[in-house]
């Protein structure tokens, strides 16, 4: 077993290929044990703080269920549940929580904040999402791909379609470079990833055999893909001008059945971190329809609900992979 005890999980850039593969294998083992009813608790007596500056369904539920399964207690601090960033600095909050808790999860805006929590709390800190990165999501995405495709990670051709600067796109590119995947990013030139991050990933890829390719050409980019992946085009709270600009750029990149056919792979799977705007059955979805006339955004309802979609298996795997991170870094 790899010794990751007391390590924080802030970005996959902090981990080696062997360490990432260990976490993925541990996720498989823990999932199998839960299904078989033979799970052994490694977090008994541990207290975990969950800091959420941004609301969440999957991340919160995954951390709470994983902690409960493993015997830990959690305290949820929602967007209005603490003074961090308002009356108290993140450095001070880190030192307060570090004296009471054995581990801290943070989901919010700034990568700098999660790094500050890790530096000053003295306990493992786990990144549940920042504007720059989403490392726990990637573990679930990769585990799901392996389960569905029955291929080792290095043989998977993983394609992200959409906004190449998105935090999930960033995290996937990092993860793919570490485990040796072929990673295609299909996006408009205006939405290509940060050059510094791309350079880091390309350097890692030289040592792992990974391949990173970026193109605006949809047909070229998706051909032979094993996985097509997308995420929302715009985050809530961004102004109307941004929505209009982003929709104009990304509407050709909506994942449709036609795009799945372009892969020329009958076994291609569709992944999405969720939530997804694939119909108008939500308030946000209906508002988008009213403002922009779109009944679906980043993915068609046909693909989302179709046989290639594995998004709910992927969502469940958030819990198993998050459990692996907590057990590996905090478990007895």
Curated annotation (Swiss-Prot):
Pathway: Amino-acid degradation; L-arginine degradation via ADI pathway; carbamoyl phosphate from L-arginine: step 2/2
Binding site for L-ornithine: 167, 231, 235-236
GO biological process, one term: arginine catabolic process to ornithine
One Gene Ontology term of the molecular function aspect: ornithine carbamoyltransferase activity
Record flagged with keyword Iron: no
Cellular compartment(s): Cytoplasm
Pfam families in alphabetical order: OTCace (PF00185), OTCace_N (PF02729)
Gene Ontology CC entries for this record: cytoplasm
Enzyme type, top EC level: transferase
UniProt-listed Enzyme Commission number(s): 2.1.3.3
Binding sites annotated in the UniProt record for carbamoyl phosphate: 56-59, 83, 107, 134-137, 273-274, 318
Keyword Acyltransferase appears in the UniProt entry: no
Catalysed reactions, as listed in the record: carbamoyl phosphate + L-ornithine = L-citrulline + phosphate + H(+)
Key words of the record: Arginine metabolism, Cytoplasm, Transferase
NCBIfam families in the record: orni_carb_tr (TIGR00658), PRK00779.1 (NF001986), PRK04284.1 (NF003286)
Main function: Reversibly catalyzes the transfer of the carbamoyl group from carbamoyl phosphate (CP) to the N(epsilon) atom of ornithine (ORN) to produce L-citrulline.
PANTHER family: ORNITHINE CARBAMOYLTRANSFERASE, ORNITHINE CARBAMOYLTRANSFERASE, MITOCHONDRIAL
UniProt similarity note: Belongs to the aspartate/ornithine carbamoyltransferase superfamily. OTCase family.
Protein name stated in the entry: Ornithine carbamoyltransferase 1, catabolic
Organism: Streptococcus agalactiae serotype V (strain ATCC BAA-611 / 2603 V/R)
Lineage of producing organism: Bacteria, Bacillati, Bacillota, Bacilli, Lactobacillales
